[in-house]
Amino acid sequence: MDLYLNQAEEFLEEKRPKFDEMVKNLMKLPEISLTKDIAMLTSLLITARQCLNLAVQLYRNSEMLQSKVRATLADWEYVMREKKISCLSDAEWVDKNLIPKMSKEERDLKAQFYHKDLSDGIQKMLCFQLEVDSLKRAVYNKKEDLERVRKDLGALIWGVRTEELLNNKVAPEDQEKVKAYLSTGVKDVDDYLNMGKRS
């Protein structure tokens, strides 16, 4: 367990400066464009998601690590609120309009996260809340935007592996764009989700 704790500390210390830099860059923008700034947004989301999964899966009893994760998510909330891209405020709207559009694979992934043996407080942080809230804040309230967001951003949020994202989740004409986003330093989410399973 000490080894895993050390790994978590190293991971969070390594990622936090990059996260802070992304936050600063986003705050300098007069407004956020879902298309233009999606690289920063996806990196920000994945960094928060990686920190969250590490804390939940490996160190659920460590208050220190949980507080770091909460600080990371609080910064994300601050950016989204201050930049006024929280165009959707109604969770019921998301349930009705966005969730039914998810593929079976995406639903299965959500179920995997939901059914982990977690305390109530951490479970609320992990399952559904981060994903729905992030989608809710990132999606503009226009029906024509929903499918593009689901393909370009939603697949990353739901933890789909990089190769699945490129092969199945993104229109062919957008694949080079997504490869460019991923080349900014975002690693495959599975590397972190599976860390706790290694002996």
Please report, for each region that a protein language model flagged, where it lies by residue:
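Generic structural signal for well-ordered, non-transmembrane alpha-helical segments
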Residues: 13, 42, 46-49, 53-56, ...
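Eukaryotic intrinsically disordered, low-complexity tracts enriched in Ser/Pro/Thr/Gly and charged residues
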Residues: 1-18, 22-25, 29, 198-199
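Short, charge-rich amphipathic alpha-helices with coiled-coil/heptad character
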Residues: 16-57
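Intrinsically disordered, low-complexity coil/linker segments enriched for acidic/polar
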Residues: 37, 87-89, 119, 171, ...
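Charged, alpha-helical coiled-coil and adjacent rod-like segments in eukaryotic scaffold subunits
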Residues: 100-103, 108-181
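Short acidic DE-rich linear segments
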Residues: 3, 180-199
